Amino acid sequence: MPPRLLLHLLPRGGLLPPPLRRRSPSPLLRRIPLAKCPGAFFLSPVRAFSGHSGMAAGSPEQQQQRSVVVRETVELTEKEEQIFRRLLEVVRHFGLGTQLRVAGGWVRDKLLGKDSSDIDIALDNMMGQNFCEKVNEYLESIGEKQKGIGVIQCNPDQSKHLETARMLILDTWIDFVNLRSETYAEDSRIPTMEVGTAKEDAYRRDLTINSLFFNINNNSVEDLTGRGIEDLKKGLIVTPLPAKATFLDDPLRVLRAIRFAARFNFTLAEDLKEAASDERVKSELGNKISRERIGHEIDLMMSDKHPVKAICDIHDLGLFYVVFSFPENSNPSVFDKCDQQCVSHIEAAWNLAYSIGSPVFSSGSDPKFQDEQRRLCLYSALFTPLRNMFYLDKKSKKVPVSSYIIKNSLKLKASDAETVVNIHAAGEKFAELVLLLESNVDVGTLKRKLEDEYLEIPTDSVKRVFAGLILREIKDFWRVALLISVLAYPEAENAVDILIKQDELHLRKEKYTRVERTITDLDLDGVWKLKPVLDGKSIMGVMQVKSGGPLIGKWQQRALKWQLAHPNGTMDECIEWMKQSQSKRQKVETST
């Protein structure tokens, strides 16, 4: 049975996120000035999506309106002030002389007016574990309970190149690590780590916007590359050191750059795009980085605010087949413009879902569950053009190519692959249902297919029975399957060009809306929860048998069809129908 999907319970507004908003000042926040900052800034035009894959949407004037404010101050919450004060007390109590710096994403997010609970402290003269031990000594000296210290060892597969110590301070997890510099061997992505200066540490970061420090000792933001704040102003994704050298040192940084550009709707710098498109860099990304790390980055993109922008950037930089590697032999083989079709489908699904809006994707479910379903919907849309491609695995079993990419290329959960395959299969069944509901086709053939010698379905109930059986199989995620179906069918050779047309998307939106309304009018939404009017035990009583078996299973299916054809029918009426059907059949058999 396929996993339950509830994409129709996404937050109001559909799949697309709302515009970024500046957070209102709070009386609990204390303003910390930047070391050098001329005021609030607005970002230059950035890429958005509503038309062609990989093309900027809207006029320059429209793009100018989509700007993100960068704060001129860092605002500390009351809890953050308490945490930082406690850390400074430790330094002063033991005379450590340590400069405490909050590193990376926390500083970036604060300047962008976003809350962040990800506090990483960089230490300039000691290891993280040693500092945590000093914290515990201090806690003991003031009569407080010591805290446990977790040490995260180096683990390159999880991008952990240096030992990190973690402990709970005022109910908040804090990571501690020493400042570092690093160099890479020619044949390895694992760096040689050395204790470094703050400036060396800043330059070894992946991006300038992630290289900023907040110095707790003197309450200031440090921009030691000289570019971090300026690049935030411009909305630019830039590497502190030359991009090609940075990517060859750690090719995963290509995907990190794309992910952060998508998250903040920033622009990739031209030299960065050129380096990311370099054949050697692409080769290193495919051969030097584990598939698990690649899959983790892609999954973060798909779960973030602007997944379509990320996928489009991957395609535009020539990285699609590096990231989404295909099996060696598939049937049919990879077709022309396969990558473009995949990108077109995820963008069309995103735009279609947003245009349909809250009547389809309404609130009422656990937000984490909603996010998970949105993620699976996007994977399904991305791989829709591959739904009829298969390969033979080691056991000569026929496996969908989309399943291979999810499980082998991205190393995601097997259940993710199963869900995507199930959505594609459901979409195909929905195509048949759409044809039935949308046209005046003769239902005679379908009527005969649903009936047998014991069951006769009224002509005006055929559509309801057929649709009900499909929905009972698809269950909660029928709207997802319908969304994928109206994008995938009818098939078009030039899908890349077709799906970018607003009038075409409008037609498919109208089709979705009509079918969704028809299913609702037939009172089938939730039909999979319908309790059978007759259970197996009741059927056995009518049949006058003492044990179940295939015969009872067949009658359960007939009773379900009868129930769908007679939504107001009672148990007694269903039993009477069964008795009459058996009696009629017995008379026919006797006469013959």
Language model region names:
Residues 1-592:
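Catalytic cores of the polymerase beta-like nucleotidyltransferase superfamily
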